[in-house]
Design a protein with these regions (language model features):
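Short S/T/G/P-rich N-terminal loop/turn motif that feeds into the first structured element of a domain
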Residues: 1-74, 78-97
Length: 97
């Protein structure tokens, strides 16, 4: 099992909006575990946590996004404009034991 953690450092005042966008757009994604915002540490962070059986499944998920279904296209529409709401980001991949 692997855990994917995507962290976005948002522009001030945008973290809650970005978190809401992700929560709504990814509501039907079976891999989504949590959408979180910071309480301590660096300000204005949104963390998206997803879970996959292995890296191969994660890669297949990315490939599927290049040929989106109608449902995926609707999710992508909900995310329009989020790129302007954050300044940086990072992805970490963890293996569970």
């Amino acid at each position: 099992m692997i855990i994917i953690q995507d962290t976005f450092v948002c522009k001030p005042g945008n973290a809650s909006r970005v978190a809401k966008m992700f929560k709504e757009a990814m509501a039907s994604d079976p891999h989504l575990v949590n959408v979180m915002t910071d309480v301590t540490g660096q300000y204005n962070r949104v963390v998206i946590v997803s879970q996959f059986n292995n890296l191969s499944d994660f890669e297949k998920n990315w490939e599927a996004m290049s040929h989106p279904t109608k449902e995926m296209e609707e999710s992508m529409k909900k995310m329009q404009g989020y790129q302007e709401m954050y300044v940086s980001g990072a992805r970490e991949i963890f293996r569970t034991w």
